[in-house]
Amino acid sequence: GNATFHCWKRGGHGTTDLKKGISQSCDVYFYEIAKRTGIERIAEMARRLGFGARLGLDLPGEKPGLIPSDEWKRLVIGSPWQQGETLLAGIGQGYVLTTPLQLAVMTARLVNGGVAVTPHLTRDIISMDSIVRRNKVENRDIGLIPSHLALVRDAMNSVVNVPSGTAFNSRIKKPEFRMGGKTGTAQVRRISKQERENRVLKNNELPWKERDHALFVGFAPVDSPRYAISVVVEHGGGGSKVAAPIARDVLEMVQRRNVAWARNKQSSGEPAISNVIISDSNDKSRRGEFGHGD
């Protein structure tokens, strides 16, 4: 078509590779990668990472989200797929629907070496004298190339721990607790030409229900990931300013607590074993975008 796709940053980011594209959240980089990759390969990889299907959480009402394809659009909407829709899907916009749980699972699979994880609220249900139910822990390899995963993990580290990264102001300063992650902003709607003429120039000048959603996914510690987290703040604005600080506070608190807990257990002579599960049960599907910079 005749549409022009712009980056969130006026003037763009210049020459960009994977690390810079992720670290500085360059829309145009991901538009180009999506164009070269195509919607079918994007959809196939998204499903491997946990999108587009229920994950099996131990609660009713889990939503599957949606990963679109040419076949889906022809069946549901009755028209063929367009290249511009591939570009939008490449940054999680358009028809894409995700849940906070899926975002956290995606992050876990990216940083744990490409192993499928099955999210559970509990590991075991135990009566007074026996285990009543034990949740199955899946350890299926989803077939990702280790060197590719290492590149993504390094880029997510730079998002938070390199000064040019979009979440640098939300970094955890204690070296052993450092987190990596990715900021995102899910656009609710564009500012119209008429609104711009009336001096409505910024997203936070729109009515609250029409403002962008703030997103961040993260993991910690960077060197040996143990925790994955997703934060979605509806109508919160930019992910770097709103969602990333929440993830930082949670991940730092959990790690500090576990260090103190293990120290207390060791001093009492008990084995220092900890099982921590953090879950966001707000699994409403929403339109999401994970390349839009902020």
Q: Which functions belong to the PLM regions below?
A:
Residues 1-228, 279-280, 287-294:
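Beta-lactam-recognizing serine transpeptidase/beta-lactamase-like catalytic domain environment
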Residues 144, 209, 235-246:
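Short alpha-helix boundary/capping segments
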Residues 215, 230-233, 246:
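C-terminal soluble interaction/assembly domains
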Residues 131-140, 246-294:
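Short, gly/Ser/Thr-rich active-site loops of penicillin-recognizing serine hydrolases
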